[in-house]
Design a protein with these regions (language model features):
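Substrate-binding surface in catalytic domains of secreted glycosidases
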Residues: 1-78
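Acidic-and-aromatic substrate-binding clefts and catalytic sites of carbohydrate-active enzymes
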Residues: 7, 107-109, 137-140
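Solvent-exposed, polar/charged alpha-helical surfaces in well-ordered, non-transmembrane soluble domains
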Residues: 22, 115-119, 123, 150, ...
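Hydrophobic, secondary-structure "cap" segments at the distal end of domains
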Residues: 65-126
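Aromatic-rich peripheral "rim/lid" segments of glycoside hydrolase catalytic domains that contact
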Residues: 135-174
């Protein structure tokens, strides 16, 4: 079950979150007939870039006229050196990122939202997770960092390697 594209993306008419956690919780009822231990949830290493629209705004034509797909690797420099700012949407449980002039925005996962999703997946007994596209957050090895890294995928790997906690898990829906 893909956690991404639960919005209009660039194929619809309203600019909204790509991977809203709230949408996963909402859509869960549709999967009820299938044993959740047989379901893997898809996580996205890409998002959507929009220009000339505000989040939730309906476009006067196809969203593809206002935006495009953007990989995490393409997105990251905007935040690191481009002055883009994050605004968390507590209702959707994910963030938007805005350009300095607020004429552009991106909806994309970040390490915090990715961590919340994998915690929810494991707490609720799903089979696991998979990515679309795995390489979109790839960090090539360097002399200083000789191992391949992934900005988002490594968050999931780290969580899965942690010993099970005895404390109650607040990520669980049931």
């Amino acid at each position: 079950v893909m956690a991404d594209d639960m919005c209009d993306g660039i194929g619809g008419s309203t600019a909204s979150h790509n991977t809203a956690m709230a949408k996963l919780r909402e859509k869960r009822a549709h999967w009820a007939p299938v044993d959740k231990r047989q379901l893997c949830l898809g996580l996205a290493n890409y998002g959507f870039y929009y220009k000339g629209l505000k989040p939730g705004e309906k476009a006067d034509g196809p969203l593809s006229r206002y935006g495009s797909y953007i990989t995490y690797r393409e997105f990251l420099p905007r935040v690191e050196t481009g002055g883009w700012t994050e605004e968390y949407d507590p209702e959707a449980e994910v963030s938007y990122y805005f350009s300095p002039d607020r004429e552009e925005f991106v909806t994309i996962e970040n390490p915090v939202s990715m961590r919340r999703k994998i915690e929810w997946i494991t707490a609720n007994g799903f089979r696991g997770a998979f990515w679309w596209e795995f390489h979109h957050d790839y960090v090539a090895p360097t002399a200083e960092q000789p191992a391949v890294r992934h900005h988002l995928n490594d968050v999931v790997t780290a969580h899965l390697k942690e010993p099970a906690a005895d404390a109650p898990n607040t990520a669980k829906d049931e």
